[in-house]
Amino acid sequence: MKKDLISNHIQLDDSGKLIHLLGLEGLSKQYLIHILDTADSLIDVSGNLKKSKALDDIFVANLFFEPSTRTRNTFEIAAMRSSANVINVDLANSALKKNEDLLNTMRTLKAMQIDMFVIRHKQNGLPHHVVQHLKDVSILNAGDGINAHPTQALLDMLSIRQHKKTFENLSVAIVGDITHSRVAHSDIQALKTLGTTDIRLIAPKVLQYNLAPCSVVKHFDDIEPGLKNCDVVIVLRLQKERMIEADIPNEQEYFDNFGLTPKRLALAKPDAIVMHPGPTNRGVEIDSNVADGNQSIILQQVTNGIAVRMAVMQILVNKS
């Protein structure tokens, strides 16, 4: 899918209402805050998730063409907590194995009165392609190639907002395989939209993200100056499955140079928070003492992922 064809304008209707969630580019600061506020309203004062009847009589189909534990399960739980009916399509035994076209499979499922599809696929822009050919059903992007992962970015923003007063004055470091990370790409977009003016991308040069010149984004190929006095550290794993073999770093060498250790974390502000979208590879991109430490909010991110996905689903069907 050509990058210039991956446009998010098709996720809004003529009145500006969100009818699909394909990516965060093109959504206003006010709309992102609306999603975060809706997610917050689904968490009680004790930090527990509420249940809702908002998706009663709605049928949601999960189509995950890439391996997933956290994302698929949190989407399923989010739908169930909103009283939706959920099916996880068994792709290994579906008609796709008989060379049926994906769109034909989805049209067949839609004929079974599916209201919403949650799609994860290795191809950049696949959810956008589906939206252009499948009408009167909501499409929710659960990650497409290295392009975007909008709900992960939203849950990251919710997690940050729960610990920091404002986005505008934050210094946020993103450490790891930025080139192949759809999470990084969506996090950068969300942070820029919410007003963050100091975003630091820390990675070996071969794993950096070739952004257009931007005053709020700085690149570092040395972790220590990149972490200095930052408020938030988002750690990413090495996505070996998306790399050519020649670019895959030696794990021990990578940890020695870019792993987040307690000593390196001490360079950040004392109240800095540590985040990771999972799965974590301890001893590669993050030390266990950091992942399990007092500054880590990794498990809180998982809970917030359910709240955010509940919120998005409810907004898409206009029942938030």
UniProtKB/Swiss-Prot annotation:
Reactions the enzyme catalyzes = carbamoyl phosphate + L-aspartate = N-carbamoyl-L-aspartate + phosphate + H(+)
Classification via Pfam families: OTCace, OTCace_N
Q: Which UniProt keywords apply?
A: Pyrimidine biosynthesis, Transferase
Lipid biosynthesis is among the record's keywords = no
A GO BP entry: 'de novo' pyrimidine nucleobase biosynthetic process
Q: Where does L-aspartate bind?
A: K98, R182, R237
Q: In which pathway does it act?
A: Pyrimidine metabolism; UMP biosynthesis via de novo pathway; (S)-dihydroorotate from bicarbonate: step 2/3
Q: Does the keyword Transferase apply?
A: yes
Alphabetized SUPFAM superfamilies for the sequence: Aspartate/ornithine carbamoyltransferase (SSF53671)
Q: What InterPro entries does this protein map onto?
A: Asp/Orn_carbamoyltranf_P-bd (IPR006132), Asp/Orn_carbamoylTrfase (IPR006130), Asp/Orn_carbamoylTrfase_sf (IPR036901), Asp_carbamoyltransf (IPR002082), Asp_carbamoyltransf_Asp/Orn-bd (IPR006131)
Q: Which positions does UniProt annotate for carbamoyl phosphate binding?
A: R70, T71, R120, H149, Q152, G278, P279
What are the coiled-coil residue ranges? none
What Enzyme Commission number(s) appear in the record?
2.1.3.2
Q: Which GO terms describe its cellular component?
A: cytosol
Gene Ontology molecular functions: amino acid binding; aspartate carbamoyltransferase activity
Functional description taken from the UniProt entry: Catalyzes the condensation of carbamoyl phosphate and aspartate to form carbamoyl aspartate and inorganic phosphate, the committed step in the de novo pyrimidine nucleotide biosynthesis pathway.
* Binding partners and assembly: Heterododecamer (2C3:3R2) of six catalytic PyrB chains organized as two trimers (C3), and six regulatory PyrI chains organized as three dimers (R2).
In which family does this protein belong, per the annotation? Answer: Belongs to the aspartate/ornithine carbamoyltransferase superfamily. ATCase family.
Q: Which HAMAP family match?
A: Asp_carb_tr
- Protein name as it appears in the record: Aspartate carbamoyltransferase catalytic subunit
Task: Give the originating organism.
Answer: Ruthia magnifica subsp. Calyptogena magnifica
Q: Which gene encodes it?
A: pyrB
